[in-house]
A protein has these predicted regions:
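N-terminal periplasmic "start-of-domain" segments of outer-membrane beta-barrel proteins
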Residues: 30-58, 85
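N-terminal periplasmic accessory domains that precede
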Residues: 62-68, 84-87, 98-99, 116-119, ...
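Short acidic/polar hinge/loop motifs at secondary-structure boundaries
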Residues: 105-135
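Transmembrane beta-barrel wall of Gram-negative outer-membrane proteins
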Residues: 178-204, 214-281, 307-309, 427, ...
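Flexible loop and strand-edge segments within Gram-negative outer membrane beta-barrel domains
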Residues: 247-253, 263-324, 335-357, 406, ...
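Surface-exposed extracellular loop regions of Gram-negative outer-membrane beta-barrel proteins
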Residues: 280, 335-339, 392-399, 443-454, ...
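Outer membrane beta-barrel strand-and-loop segments of large Gram-negative receptors
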Residues: 355, 359-365, 416-418, 513-519, ...
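Gram-negative outer-membrane beta-barrel transporters
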Residues: 428-429, 433, 441-442, 545-547, ...
Length: 728
């Protein structure tokens, strides 16, 4: 493993260049990115930005989370097959921001643990993915502590002339490791003023088979020894005849997208964007593997259908008369529903908890550009309305009774408001200045209507918080391909409804209760980026340090003076999020590309992250900090054939580096922690004509058994993937 990592350090991989999957000599500085919301040359941005645009790479993944995983640019945690929780520079879930087409996916119930919301965005219709590394609160507001994942779906394309013309794609994908079947169709119908883009994807996933090649030190790790069925009204723990089949991991998902573009002239656009995503029930696999005294703890534990509905209208204008030449406004509405259903083994009581969130949002951005640079002014408002319900059903008598809701059961709202200003100034001789400020105000009002079950010592939780965030940095772009950038930035995250009002258990015997006195978290970041980009090779390095102030860590707490309470029929230790810590997170990334033969490149990336906080006088590991991770590959490509042999790897995460009170899920690791691993993979794409593209991949060729840090499910074993894309 040591020699392997040395190879990574020598050859590296430019995350941005790998993401392009481009064998031409395009200079990194010439790449246009949307990190600043308006199209900007990446050389004019101090912050590190990762870019993924290869359509074959994007389309050949099982879901959007796997795009990030397989790129090697972002660590992703999974609790179940239908999941994927990105981690950027040691920050995860509600501490990073997910965006789709300029709209915030983060909402008032985004939890601080692990999320699966990213899979509700269909990767089959994605055009590009951008990753902003580090605090990005100046332009993006609350939650962007660790960074931003920007997902952009395809844009409708206009045609010449008044007559409508149609074109589109059909994609069929099959993968053996999970009996995966995915069908995708998209059609673009357009003339010179109107364009209609329609997309449909249907996905079916079976039980996920983990690798059979286990470490001799942990010969039974990850084995699925049992599964539960109910026969004649009785729960039965059955012996699993194939311990590598992770039973109860299958699910289905349907995604729809409709865009309507109207472009009355060269300088004005109107865009309607509708997205619908709905899944089947998705079993919480990690919970279904828990045991007590040799018996399963749960007979059932699953997420109900995960629904995400989005409608947005975007108005764009350019060459406007006046100080600002470019502008856009996005008004959006989202409706989100998620639920959790659980039943203990041999119990007739089945608990249903459902959350519905309605979100209204609007943001307006203006851009002034001249020979000295540009000035970007923006305003933003989002309003979240949360409804939380719960009940218990006796599956024997069908009688319903009351149980605690996950969040406050009365009227619950959050509002985000901001005004921001960002400047890019050309100082001459290759020097560029970035600086900006943002004023944030967040309001939260949660009402606890029924306190008879939990006996809350309060009936509401109200907060109004204001925060000023900003950034400043310098970049130097030399004429010989060298680039150096140094930046300072701050981030801000206001406690949301999930932080302030939630009652839940991350695992049996451990319950988290509300702490209405929780305050906002802040990050202060310094980073240095150095790179060199030439015809035959490119390399880059990023070093960062983040001070995490007012960090909310989950720690022991009391509820009505009690350190233990009865929850879900189990006497449980009480915990709550508390602003107890000042944490330090630091790390680096090295990356590069080397052209070894014509159209043949070696590419690689390696990321190291470390995070600690002080609990009194004791220094403790911060949770969510991934082990070292990365990717190395050799790729040959031309117009007809692309082939890449690559490896994805993770280093050790020793138990001494786990946060045992947080979200690191040590119960799903070995006694020593999460072992290091590496996989060998092959991906090929053959394009016999402009209308047909054929793909063949083998993931995890050696059938390695492994698991990502903090994950409750083992990764897929040897997996054969066939795909066919027909364009018309």
């Amino acid at each position: 493993m040591r020699n392997y990592l040395l190879a990574v350090l020598f050859f590296g991989m430019s995350a941005d260049l790998l993401a392009q999957q481009d064998t031409t000599a395009k200079q990194l500085q010439d790449v246009v990115v949307l990190a600043n919301k308006f199209p900007t040359l990446s050389k004019n941005i101090v912050q590190r930005v990762g870019l993924i645009t290869d359509k074959n790479f994007i389309n050949q993944q099982a879901n959007t989370a796997d795009i990030l995983t397989q790129s090697g640019q972002v660590f992703v945690q999974k609790s179940q097959s239908g999941g994927g929780s990105p981690v950027i520079r040691g920050f995860e879930a509600s501490r990073i921001l997910l965006m789709v087409d300029g709209v915030r996916l983060n909402n008032a119930i985004f939890r601080a643990g692990h999320l699966q919301n990213i899979i509700t965005v269909d990767n089959m219709i994605l055009d590009r993915v951008e990753i902003n590394y580090g605090p990005s609160s100046t332009l993006y507001g609350s939650d962007a502590l660790g960074g931003v994942v920007n997902l952009y779906t395809k844009h409708p394309k206009l045609n010449d002339g008044e007559a409508f013309k149609a074109n589109g794609n059909i994609i069929q994908r099959y993968a053996s490791g999970q009996n995966e079947n995915r069908t995708h169709v998209d059609i673009n119908l357009a003339n010179n003023k109107w364009a209609y883009l329609t997309s449909f994807t249907n996905s079916s996933f079976g039980n996920l088979r983990q690798g059979n090649n286990r470490s001799s030190d942990y010969p039974d790790f990850g084995k699925r020894l049992f599964y539960v069925t109910r026969e004649n009204g009785v729960d039965i723990a059955n012996v699993n005849d194939n311990v590598n089949i992770q039973r109860e991991t299958g699910y289905t998902q349907t995604d729809l997208l409709q865009k309507v573009l109207f472009k009355p002239n060269e300088n004005t656009e109107h865009l309607l964007n509708i997205q619908l995503s709905n899944s089947s029930n998705i079993n919480r696999y990690d919970r279904l593997t828990e045991t007590s005294k040799g018996l399963p703890i749960y007979a059932e534990w699953y997420y109900g259908p995960q629904k995400r509905n989005l409608a947005s209208y975007k108005f764009s204008a350019k060459k406007i008369k006046g100080y600002f030449q470019d502008a856009f406004v996005i008004a959006n509405y989202q409706n989100i529903e998620e639920s959790r259903i659980s039943r203990k083994f041999k119990s007739n009581n089945k608990d249903f908890r459902t959350e519905k969130v309605n979100v209204l949002g609007v943001n307006a951005d203006l851009l002034h550009t001249d020979s000295n640079g540009d000035i970007h002014l923006g305003v933003e408002s989002y309003f979240d309305f949360v409804n939380s319900t719960a009940y218990r059903n006796n599956i024997s008598t069908n009688a319903n009774s009351a149980i605690t809701t996950r969040y406050s059961d009365g009227p619950t709202t959050m509002a985000y408001h901001a005004i921001y200003l960002q400047q890019t100034k050309f100082l001459g001789a290759g020097w560029v200045l970035n600086d900006g400020l943002r004023l944030n105000m967040v309001q939260m009002n949660a009402q606890f209507k029924d306190t008879s079950l939990m006996h809350f010592p309060f009936t509401d939780a109200k907060q109004t918080n204001a925060a000023l965030t900003g950034n400043i940095g310098l970049a130097y772009n030399a004429t010989n391909g060298y680039r150096v950038a140094f930046g300072l930035s701050s981030g801000f995250r206001n406690p949301n409804i999930d932080d302030l009002t939630k009652v839940f258990d991350t695992h049996t015997g451990y319950v988290v209760v509300p702490n209405k006195d929780l305050k906002p978290e802040y990050t202060y970041n310094a980073e240095l980026n150095v790179s060199k980009n030439t015809q035959g090779y490119a390399w880059g390095a990023s070093v960062f340090y983040t001070m995490f102030k007012n960090a909310a860590v989950v720690d022991k707490f009391t509820f009505n003076g009690q350190s233990k309470i009865l929850y879900q029929g189990v006497m449980s230790d009480v915990y709550a999020p508390q602003n107890k810590a000042t944490a330090n997170v630091y790390g680096f990334n090295v990356n590069g590309r080397l052209e070894v033969l014509y159209n043949t490149n070696i590419t690689a990336t390696y990321t190291y992250t470390k995070g600690t906080y002080k609990d009194g006088l004791t220094e403790m590991p911060l949770d969510h900090i991934p082990p070292t991770y990365g990717r190395i590959g050799i790729k040959h490509g031309n117009a007809k054939l692309n082939a890449e042999l690559f490896s994805v790897f993770n280093g050790w995460k020793h138990m001494s580096d786990y946060n045992l009170n947080g979200e690191d899920n040590e119960v799903y690791a070995t006694k020593d922690g999460m072992p290091s691993w590496m996989t060998l993979n092959l991906a090929t794409a053959y394009v016999p004509s402009k209308h047909i593209s054929l793909g063949f991949q083998i993931e995890n060729i050696t059938d390695k058994n492994y698991r990502y840090f903090a994950s409750g499910i083992s990764a897929i074993g040897r997996n054969y993937i066939l795909s066919c894309k027909i364009s018309f």
